[in-house]
Design a protein with these regions (language model features):
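Non-catalytic, peripheral interaction segments enriched in hydrophobic/basic residues
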Residues: 376-423, 427-431
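A conserved non-catalytic segment of reverse transcriptases
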Residues: 197, 203-206, 307-374, 378, ...
Length: 504
């Protein structure tokens, strides 16, 4: 059914879908939504009703039947989310709302209906919280947009877009107006209105929701993308489509000078614009002067405030030259001179990201000496593996990877020495070895963890992590439309590059 919804949505961009609530309340649909919800790690965390995964599974069929009846009769009312606060990298706290499990099941069922429809509408350079897309897609796209265009190439200015408290300031009426462009089922619209108006329980007190979309629910990323799709549409209509790009003809100074003088005098030169968005973070690349970039920033601010009632944080929305570098989605992107003398964009690990991660690991290894040594090594390996996977396509990682390897290697050795109150040299003699033939030596421990598993574990070395060149396959297509596997030929590689650079 998701395949049909995606096909219908793709074939007719103006189609409004009706009778969708019947699909949300379908028995098979709810069973699948419950299976996905209860299989997630967050199912163990209860909402305001105190029901966790174990309690829900004990009476699942009766609960799903009750949910279905309430949905079809219009009596279903979402409970307020339980608000918790998690620390952010800058030391501040981020509020999250944890819905109860029955609301999470309903949200999952709604997501399974709505996402195939909107995936046909969302802009190709929108990557945040969408299926078959990731941070690496966005970074790769920005790097392609910053490629040196050759002779006469002007400097490029980058606008780092920052929306102030986006999730908490979404205008409910404007959001529902955007949803009605695709949904004509009034019962589903009423359910969605109840969802965004459910409020939360914060420190034992109820907080009503007058604006914003709930953070923490499975449907929240889709709702945020629906709202910001209006910004994508405005960018496409005014700066990115082929007609607008033909007016912005100043990409190459040598080409521009070849135009007849009469044509040059009658046509006003405008800077070319590139755009990439990941959730509420976006980047604009302006090929022109800094004044052109400031005009573009002001135009974005005006549209967001006047049409969407969103605030662009002008203090954090910086304008930076690409040669000075900027940070986007945890990567530092800068244009450097390559081995053949041409300027090329590279992505690197920001020093601040490295420092915070290293300090986090050092803090973990500076105490808790009673912890099982196998559990400690497993915990370290999971963190190191996740960090290496996130930066596996980043350029120039060898220095930071080797530096972090040395830090963790020596700090873990001192942790073992404090734990067993023995000399460092004896520990190195007993526990330093090569995990496999030809690999670098590291800490190799054998023993039993707290879960009862017995075996040998080696401390992960980042310098040996897999590195590669990131590629994607047809990210502009709706992933819910079933297709035969497309062979990745030379022609399809050129299509990938052309897609990423289509707005440059």
């Amino acid at each position: 059914m998701q395949n049909k919804l995606a096909i219908w949505s793709t074939e007719n961009k103006e189609r409004k879908f009706d009778r969708l609530l019947r699909l949300v309340a379908d028995r098979t649909w709810l069973i699948e939504a419950a299976r996905i919800t209860l299989a997630s790690s967050g199912a163990k965390t209860p909402g305001v009703d105190g029901v966790d995964k174990r309690k829900m599974e004990e009476n699942l069929h009766h609960e799903l039947a009750t949910i279905r009846t309430e949905l079809l009769t219009g009596l279903y009312n979402p409970l307020p989310a339980r608000r918790v606060y998690i620390p952010k990298a800058n030391g501040k706290m981020r509020p999250l709302g944890i819905p109860c499990l029955r609301d999470r099941i309903v949200q999952r069922a709604m997501l399974m209906v709505m996402e195939p429809i909107w995936e046909s509408d969302f802009h190709p350079v929108s990557y945040g919280f969408r299926p078959a897309r990731s941070v690496h897609h966005a970074i790769r796209t920005v790097k392609l947009q910053l490629q040196d265009s050759g002779r006469g190439s002007k400097g490029r200015w980058v606008i780092e877009g920052d929306l102030a408290s986006y999730f908490d300031t979404v205008h409910h009426r404007l959001f529902m107006k955007a949803v009605r462009k695709r949904i004509a089922d009034q019962r589903l619209l009423d359910l969605l209105w109840k969802l965004i108006k459910a409020g939360c329980i914060d420190r034992g007190l109820f907080r009503a929701s007058s604006e914003g979309v709930p953070q923490g629910g499975v449907i929240s990323p889709l709702l945020s993308n629906i709202m910001l799709h209006e910004f994508d549409t405005w960018m496409e209509a005014n700066y990115l489509n082929e007609k607008k790009r033909s007016v912005r003809w100043g990409w190459n100074e040598s080409v521009r000078q070849q135009w007849p003088i009469a044509v040059r005098e009658q046509r006003q030169w405008k800077p070319a614009i590139s755009y990439c968005r990941y959730a509420d973070d976006f980047v604009l690349v302006v090929k022109g002067t800094k004044a052109d970039a400031e005009v573009m920033r002001e135009a974005c601010r005006g549209f967001l405030e006047d049409q969407l009632k969103l605030t662009l944080n002008m203090d954090k929305t910086r304008i930076t030259h690409v040669n000075d570098g900027f940070v986007f989605l945890g990567h530092r992107i800068i244009r450097k001179r390559g081995p053949r003398g041409r300027m090329r964009p590279v992505s690197m690990i920001p020093w601040e990201k490295y420092r915070r991660f290293a300090e986090k690991l050092v803090k973990q290894l500076s105490g808790d000496y009673s912890k099982n040594r196998m559990d400690m090594m497993e915990h370290l390996n999971r963190q190191l593996g996740g960090w290496a996977a996130f930066y596996q396509y980043t350029d120039h990682t060898a220095t930071m990877f080797s530096k972090l390897d040395r830090t963790v290697f020596w700090k873990f050795g001192y942790w073992l020495a404090r734990k067993y109150r023995c000399g460092f040299r004896s520990l190195m003699r007993d526990y330093i070895d090569a995990p496999e033939a030809g690999q670098a030596k590291t800490w190799v421990l054998e023993g039993q963890n707290s879960r009862g598993w017995y075996g040998a574990i080696a401390l992960r070395r980042l310098i040996t992590s897999r590195k590669g060149h990131f590629t994607w396959r047809t990210p502009s297509e709706n992933p819910y439309i079933l297709r035969e596997e497309i062979r990745h030929t030379i022609e399809s590689r050129y299509a990938d590059v052309a897609f990423a650079m289509s707005n440059t």
